[in-house]
Amino acid sequence: NILAIGDRECSVQRRHQKIIEIAPSFDLPEKTRLSIQGAAEKLAKSVGYYSLGTFEFLVDSKSQGQEKFAFIEANARLQVEHTVTEEVTGVDLVQSQIEIANGKSLKALELNETPQAIGYAIQARINMETIESDGTVKPTTGELTTYDPPSGPGVRTDGFGYAGFFPSTNYDSLLAKVIVHSARSNFKEASKKCERALSEFRIEGLATNIPFLRGILKSDDFLTRKATPRWVDENAPSLIENSEFETRHILNEQLNPLESGPVSYTHLRAH
């Protein structure tokens, strides 16, 4: 009655805070993946854990098949990035958690074995913040004058906002999450889809980290899956330069819409 639903890659962080998450974890040897899932199941069973939870591990990428990984922590809840697991497995984790709390078994939920992950899913966290060249994060605030999230096949936006909304600075800076799913096992294709979705997200009235996220998604290190938890902090200057280019591009589209072409101007959506 214990089941590992899947795994995620959460290495892209700034100041130890996740900003981009991926499912499934890429370049993870199947033997290591199964060992990690087995460790999570063993731990959950040993403490009599009931409900859904998140078990985090750190993998030594230099171990080369030696399965060196360490347990970090267990969270007795779903994480912000549960969305990418939902997209690649087709399992509604929130609904499943509620049904388990109401007494349903995994068998009743037809969760008899670990679901096969289909393709890649990527989540980008839209935060009300800007990032300086030294990696310093500065929170932003203001009244939203435009809040128009992306949509279309394989594109999901979880968030809250509207024109006239003034987000409180007393809470987390997270404004929205953009989640994309590509059914093909092509990581670069999924990354491009996420970057394109972010480019379609129109937020005006306050600054966000969207340009920075787009810069990351276009980075060669990210696309070749070399990012580690310290990668963003160590490469902040070059990533900032990329994000500044994206900022100028966004402003140019807003100020000169006709020069950007009819699609950018009319902001077409597929439903």
Protein language model features and the residues they cover:
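Phosphate-binding site of ATP-dependent enzymes
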Residues: 1-9, 31, 35, 58-69, ...
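ATP-dependent carboxylate/phosphate-activation module, predominantly the ATP-grasp catalytic core
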Residues: 1-38, 78-95
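Flexible glycine/proline-rich, aromatic-decorated loop/lid segments
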Residues: 5-16, 58, 65-78, 148-168
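A long amphipathic alpha-helix within ATP-dependent nucleotide-binding catalytic cores
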Residues: 22-64
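Catalytic cores of soluble metabolic enzymes centered on carboxylation/carboxyl-transfer
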Residues: 40, 83-269
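Short flexible coil/turn linkers enriched for glycine and charged/polar residues
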Residues: 49-51, 65-66, 78, 118, ...
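Active-site and channel-lining beta-strand-loop segments
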Residues: 56-61, 74, 176-185
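Short glycine/threonine-rich loop-to-helix capping motif typified by GTGT followed
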Residues: 59-71, 217-228
